Amino acid sequence: MNDNLFVSLDRLLLEFVFQYEQDISIKEDTIQRINKCLESIKENKANVSKLREAINKVDEDIAFHYKHSKEIKDSCSNWKPTCDVFHKHEDYIKDQLTAYQETNEKDKKMYHDYICQYEDVLKQYQLKYSETRFSCKYYEKKKEHEEIKNRVLACTEQLQLNETILMKFLVPAPFPSLTKWTLYVVNLRYRTQDILKRANNFTKRSFELEKEADDMEIEINSLNKMARLFESKTFSEALDEKNKNTEKRKEFEERIFEKDEQVSNRSSQNSQLLLPCESQKFVRNMNSSEARVTDKKEESSANQSKFVRSDVRQKENNPQIFNDSGMDSNSKSSHIPAVKSSQGFMQFRLNQPNYNQRIEKEHIDAECGDKETVRQVRESKCSTQALYIEHFGKSIENNSVEEERDENFPQTPETPSFLRTPEALKTPESMEKMQFPKSPFFEITKNATSEGHKQKDSPGFSFLMSYTSRSPGLNLFDSSVSDSEISSDQFNEHYSAVNLNPSSSQQGIGNLFGKSEGEDAFTFSFSSDSSHTFGAGKDDFSFPFSFEQDPSTMTSSSSKDFSSSQNKTQFMFF
């Protein structure tokens, strides 16, 4: 029994606990709902207050508009009788307007009828008047008056045209006479020619400046390379190499003097000068260039030194030409003037102060390993001459110790360097690879070497090959100061016309200053004998000739290469 009671009590307690928990959850839910309802009530109260305010504003507006409507009704009731009066007055005015329009139309019809009647009467009167004698006279005079009026108008127009023409003639003419007009035209032509000359000079000057800028860039690059080269060497090694080079140079000069004496003895039999045919224009350009030597000494000396260096290369090329032409018996006699001219060239080259420095530079290029493009050094201006060495398009300035290439000098004194054929020049392919500066001498040597197997060399060609730009007497073919008027193409055209046959040796001098097309003929006389001999590398052969000098070269002509100031010039060959 007790157990059942305890069990039932436990059940009741559990039910009470469960029900208590349910009541607590329900109470919490009701509290949350009450809070939500309170919040909604607050919101509704706020909305109600806003609505009341809006209703109050609307009531105020309604009261204002009601008052305004009452005022409008009162004013309408007050203005209604006046409006009725205005309507009545409007109706009255409209009735009057219609009455006036009807009367105007009636008057128009009446007046139109009157006008038609008056026109008919006028026509009747005109007919009657035209039949009278006075009317006929009147019409005749009227026609005459109209004709006179038309004539006057035409005359006035013609007078206006004449006045305009006369005003044109009254303006003073720019040229009162034919002579003044011709003078003006000539002056204009002279000015245009002067302007064209100046433009040409400016273009030449700009081209020269561009060329100098390129040369300076090349020199700067080469100087940087030389500076790096000299940094790698010690001063003691440079002194030893310079001493060796001076000894070799002395031996080389002794061999050259011995060879020159032998050649002078053999060449005494052939005193006839053989020169290539050259045009008169080339000689005149030389004459104008000689006057510029005194004005531009630095530029001319620099350009001449270029040809001095290039002639050394030409001397090395001469043996190949001699070997190619050695098969012909007629061309053998042409070697003697070439050797004689090379003798004078070498004697002059020994007097050059900067000749040794060029030889020393070649060994430096060999040590640098630049075998494909050999660069030559541009000498410093410590001496009076500024020597530019252009070989394969590059120049280098050298103020310090320079070395010499051993390959350029033979170890035996039998053959000098200008008669020895280097290994690099034995084939025509190597000649084509070499890049000489663009000048008439280099163009001639290049064309001559390429055509060495087809035709024989003439004494005139050998003369050009051995020519030096700084020789004491001959400055005829000096293209370094020829004012850049004789280009390499023109020189080749003149040279291609030369007969390179040794049998025409006597015609070489006569054709030296041959008359070209469109040029004036020179007047020159020869004072040479067949008994002239060559002595000590210098020939007594000379010939004076006279020609007209340009007015620009008359004032600036130099007495260095010309012996007479009366348009007489005597050239000393060799």
Swiss-Prot record:
Positions with biased composition (Low complexity): 264-275, 552-565
Keyword Phosphoprotein: yes
Reported consequences of knocking out the gene: Mice develop normally but males and females are sterile due to defects in chromosome synapsis at meiotic prophase I. Spermatogenesis proceeds normally up to prophase I until a massive apoptosis of spermatocytes takes place at stage IV. Ovaries of female mice at 4 months of age display a lack of oocytes.
Tissue/organ expression: Most abundantly expressed in testis. Also expressed in retina and skeletal muscle.
GO CC annotation: central element; chromosome
Subcellular locations according to the entry: Chromosome
InterPro entries, per database record: SIX6OS1
Keyword Kinase assigned: no
Major place of residence: nucleus
Segments for region (Disordered): 259-313, 549-574
Assigned keywords, A-Z: Chromosome, Developmental protein, Differentiation, DNA recombination, Meiosis, Phosphoprotein, Spermatogenesis
Disulfide bridge map: none
Modified residues (Phosphoserine): S430
Residues where Phosphothreonine is found: T427
GO biological process: homologous chromosome pairing at meiosis; meiotic cell cycle; meiotic DNA double-strand break processing involved in reciprocal meiotic recombination; oogenesis; regulation of DNA-binding transcription factor activity; spermatogenesis; synaptonemal complex assembly
Subunit structure: Interacts with SYCE1. Interacts with proteasome subunit PSMA8; to participate in meiosis progression during spermatogenesis.
PANTHER family reported for this sequence: PROTEIN SIX6OS1 (PTHR35449:SF1)
Function: Meiotic protein that localizes to the central element of the synaptonemal complex and is required for chromosome synapsis during meiotic recombination. Required for the appropriate processing of intermediate recombination nodules before crossover formation.
Name of protein: Protein SIX6OS1
Organism, as annotated: Mus musculus (Mouse)
Origin organism lineage: Eukaryota, Metazoa, Chordata, Craniata, Vertebrata
